[in-house]
Amino acid sequence: MTALYSVIKFKIIELIKSGKYQANDQLPTESEFCEQYDVSRTTVRLALQQLELEGYIKRIQGKGTFVSAAKIQTPIPHKITSFAEQMRGLRSESKVLELVVIPADHSIAELLKMKENEPVNKLVRVRYAEGEPLQYHTSYIPWKAAPGLAQEECTGSLFELLRTKYNIEISRGTESIEPILTDETISGHLLTNVGAPAFLSESLTYDKNEEVVEYAQIITRGDRTKFTVEQSYHS
């Protein structure tokens, strides 16, 4: 038997999808929903909590509950693509938070197939879609592969920069994705509540000589993202 709060949740989702409630519209109050659906406040509160966790609505203290903007559909590509390409025509940009050279610790050295304490470029960026922070992106690039990286060069495609400045031809990559909850630092940069749902992507990128040229950790807002996969069938 379906829980009553789930029924209310799906009713509200249908109203959002039908256009009755549009992005940034204020929703009725809890008591108004109680009267509308003839249910208890606890039921309505549970439904709204689920809608917030799933990214359909957002609560602003002292103002009320509002419909969130539509989620950005991000394809899981079969080839390596830039952030701008993944945004499929949305206005995208990057802000560099940090670019430093650090000694590789044990875990970074293993991932980049180098010796401990060898120099590594650490690049931290926030990626924006339509002016809204979407990703917190940390890249580790062997210094010997890309010496002299400049901060002003790193606001566009990193792989294009590696190709044009350092003659590095990207060949392939591996990527894993798992759900996480944001901590205080990530939430501050992505403008979410602490403990908000997000996706952690970890990737390794190789050049044509099978050298690792980047290890990346990308944290993507869960309330603003929907991943899609295109599949084919062969009998």
UniProtKB/Swiss-Prot annotation:
InterPro entries: Bact_HTH_transcr_reg (IPR050679), Chorismate_lyase_/UTRA_dom_sf (IPR028978), Tscrpt_reg_HTH_GntR (IPR000524), UTRA (IPR011663), WH-like_DNA-bd_sf (IPR036388), WH_DNA-bd_sf (IPR036390). The keyword DNA-binding applies. Disulfide bonds: none annotated. CDD domains: WHTH_GntR. One of its GO terms (molecular function) is DNA-binding transcription factor activity. Induction: Expression is increased by growth on glucosamine. It comes from the Bacteria. Binding to DNA is allosterically inhibited by the effector glucosamine-6-phosphate (GlcN6P). N-acetylglucosamine-6-phosphate (GlcNAc6P) and glucose-6-phosphate (Glc6P) have no effect. PANTHER family: MANNOSYL-D-GLYCERATE TRANSPORT/METABOLISM SYSTEM REPRESSOR MNGR-RELATED (PTHR44846), MANNOSYL-D-GLYCERATE TRANSPORT_METABOLISM SYSTEM REPRESSOR MNGR-RELATED (PTHR44846:SF1). Transcriptional repressor of genes involved in glucosamine transport and utilization. Represses the expression of the gamAP operon by binding to the gamA-gamR intergenic region. This is HTH-type transcriptional repressor GamR. It comes from Bacillus subtilis (strain 168).
